[in-house]
UniProtKB/Swiss-Prot annotation:
Protein name from the UniProt record: Threonine--tRNA ligase
InterPro entries: aa-tRNA-synt_IIb, aa-tRNA-synth_II, aa-tRNA-synth_II/BPL/LPL, Anticodon-bd, Anticodon-bd_dom_sf, Beta-grasp_dom_sf, TGS, TGS-like
Binding site residues for Zn(2+): C333, H384, H510
Similarity annotation: Belongs to the class-II aminoacyl-tRNA synthetase family.
Repressor listed as a keyword: no
Organism per entry: Ehrlichia chaffeensis (strain ATCC CRL-10679 / Arkansas)
Any one Gene Ontology molecular-function term assigned to this protein's record: threonine-tRNA ligase activity
Domain spans labelled TGS: 1-61
Entry's localization field: Cytoplasm
Keyword annotations from UniProtKB, A to Z: Aminoacyl-tRNA synthetase, ATP-binding, Cytoplasm, Ligase, Metal-binding, Nucleotide-binding, Protein biosynthesis, RNA-binding, tRNA-binding, Zinc
Length: 633
């Protein structure tokens, strides 16, 4: 007999070898139809897997995140089976779950098309309707290699050769299909009814462009048709909001092959960039930050001292000059320590909040580049806070409050925080880790932010907070970070003179709010669908003339608005007014002033807003006052 413990403090004895579905039927009959797997001693188990030792037991239902991931894993296997049955010469490689879905990579000379996806989906439905059981088997290494070699699955043989010799090799079967897999899986294929294959793309074996080229089929799977429909509708909405499409339409930026992964900012896009930069600069000044500027090109010796050379060498752009190896900086932190080290610091000088709009470059594979979201050249709203251990809590709280304030101004109020605490292998004493972790917890709690814990996921040099924004269509974007660092200041010789007259290494807080300007602007474009808040809009006001008689008056209005720092576009073209209105709606300008003979005579304007088809007349002084109110944050 074995003892099995449950979350409700119940402990019950069962025969050794009992299976999860028997326990569910016995103790949780109401959850029978919703249960998809179990967690035994913290490890996910198939419901058909035998339990052979004392353990804890937790039911995993389809309504949980873990349950949903299992559904997606099941669907990936079903897709692989369908592809293999339809295209027998295909070799299957890997098929993991990802956010919102799954993919599988295939080695084949056949070029998959959207028409193929429809046919594959039909075959998948056939497999699902057969209600095939997922069967787990444990094989020896020799058995696994022999089997997959015999059916021509060379990539599976390669994977097996990299599995540590002390690990079990598990396979799963459903119907005629067998795949190498750790599991777990649902009892059968019937839970994978709500799915859609979404796209085909190229990939490489093991993600290395020097290896064989593969084809990747992506899909999504959900608990039911309602969730699937909502997700697919959001995909359509996301396509409409694509920052690359809107960026072209609004003439904000472009990218070209001659500067791969770098941005050509057009006037309107650069206007947004400068507005954000000036806004952040003012916020930093008001919160006690000093602004610095550090070199872009540095000798590799500094990167060797900091430890970045070993970890980031492959992502650095290098140059040779005067028999020295120089690296374009991929981050700013070592440079900020050089400024800290430029003179003797006292404990009375701390905290020092050192900010830089730091331009950095990192080599990203060309296939990973994506508009503004993934680039090679970028600018961070970077800052490093040098403080004492006793100042960690107050500095972390000040940062959280500043971050919330800034996100709110940009239209983000739904913020998720991930807290990563100490890993097993770490630098620094337990005492300083205790202080740092307590400080981060307190800062998010006092700031009234909810957080989830990522146990053991902190860096070896300190715990961290990651701040994720939820946009208008529910997508999550990780932007802000607050990372403690107990190591780099010591490694680069940073110290201050304490009240005891001795040298002490400061604690360094790496922090960012936007992340990078490029990516954050991309997020803003998609969040607002190009309809920026008025304070952020590159053109805030369009003045449209109805006839030639109103051109001089319109010019005077433009001058008056510009005197109040309003960004104005004047349209005096010889087009009908309805055409002009449609044109400026397409440009997503938030406010229109329409002027004709009547407005000239009355010293007024007809006001129309982007989100309304109504117009109303207002005296110019009142209209300007209203405009200035709308244009303020």
């Amino acid at each position: 007999m074995i003892n099995i413990h449950f979350s409700n403090n119940l402990c019950k004895q069962f025969h050794r070898g009992i299976k999860g579905h028997d326990i569910v039927n016995d103790l949780f009959p109401k959850l029978k139809n919703e249960t998809i797997a179990a967690k035994v001693n913290g490890e996910l188990y198939d419901l058909s897997r035998e339990i052979i030792e004392n353990c804890t037991f937790e039911v995993i239902t389809i309504n949980s995140e873990e349950g949903l991931e299992i559904i997606r894993h099941d669907t990936a296997h079903i897709m692989a089976q369908a592809v293999k049955e339809m295209f027998p010469d295909v070799q299957i490689t890997i098929g993991p779950t990802i956010k919102d879905g799954f993919y599988y990579d295939f080695a084949t000379n056949h070029n998959f098309s959207s028409d193929d996806l429809e046919i594959i989906e039909k075959k998948m439905i056939e497999i699902i309707n057969k209600n095939e059981s997922f069967i787990r088997e444990v094989w020896s290494r020799e058995e696994a290699i022999k089997f997959f070699s015999s059916i021509g699955e060379d990539y599976k043989v390669k994977i097996i050769s990299n599995i540590p010799s002390n690990e079990n090799i598990t396979v799963y079967k459903q119907g005629s299909f067998t795949d190498l897999c750790r599991g777990p899986h649902a009892p059968s294929t019937k839970t994978s009814r709500a799915f859609k294959l979404t796209k085909v793309s190229g990939s490489y074996w093991q993600g290395n462009s020097n290896n064989e080229r593969l084809q990747r089929i992506y899909g999504t799977a959900w608990r039911n048709e309602e969730e699937l429909k909502l997700y697919l509708n959001n995909l359509i909405e996301a396509e409409k909001r694509d920052h690359r499409k809107i960026g072209r339409e609004l003439e904000l930026f472009h990218i070209q092959n001659e500067a791969c992964g770098q941005i050509f900012w057009h006037t309107k896009g650069w206007t947004i960039y400068r507005i954000i930069e000036n806004y952040i600069r003012k916020k930093l000044e008001n919160n006690g930050y000093i602004e610095v500027k550090t070199p872009i090109l540095l000798n590799k010796e500094l990167w060797e001292k900091s430890g970045h050379w070993d970890k980031f060498r492959e992502n650095m752009f290098l140059s040779e000059a005067e028999d020295k190896t120089l690296a374009i900086k991929p981050m700013n932190c070592p440079c900020h320590i050089q400024i800290f080290n430029s003179k003797i610091r006292s404990y009375r000088d701390l905290p020092i909040r050192m900010a830089e709009f730091g331009t950095c470059h990192r080599y990203e594979a060309s296939g990973a580049l994506h508009g503004l979201m993934r680039v090679r050249g970028f600018t961070q709203d970077d800052a490093h806070i040098f403080c004492t251990e006793s100042q960690i809590t107050s500095e972390a709280l000040k940062f959280c409050n500043l971050l919330i304030e800034i996100y709110k101004d940009f239209g983000f109020t739904d913020i998720l925080v991930k807290f990563s605490d100490r890993p097993k292998n770490r630098a620094g004493s337990d005492e300083i880790w205790d202080k740092a972790e307590a400080a981060l917890k307190k800062s998010v709690e006092v700031a009234n932010l909810s957080y989830v814990l990522n146990p053991g996921d902190g860096a070896f040099y300190g715990p961290k907070l990651e701040f994720t924004l939820k946009d208008a269509i529910g997508r999550e974007w990780q932007c802000g970070t607050l990372q403690m660092d107990f190591v780099l200041p010591e490694r680069l010789g940073a110290y201050y003179i304490g009240s005891d007259g001795k040298k002490h290494h400061p604690v360094m807080l790496h922090r960012a709010i936007l992340g990078t300007f490029e990516r954050f602007i991309g997020i803003l474009i998609e969040h607002h669908s190009g309809k920026f808040p008025m304070w952020l809009a590159p053109i805030q006001l369009s003045i449209l003339t109805i006839s030639e008689d109103s051109i001089n008056y319109a010019n005077s209005l433009k001058i008056k608005a510009e005197e109040h720092n309003i960004r104005v576009e004047l349209d005096t073209t010889n087009e009908k007014i309805n055409y002009k209105i449609r044109n400026h709606i397409h440009k997503k300008v938030p406010v229109f002033w329409i002027v004709g003979k009547k407005e000239v005579e009355e010293n007024s304007v007809s006001i129309r807003y982007l989100e309304s088809n109504k117009q109303h007349v207002m005296p110019i002084d009142k209209a300007l006052k209203t405009l200035l109110t709308c244009a303020s944050i």
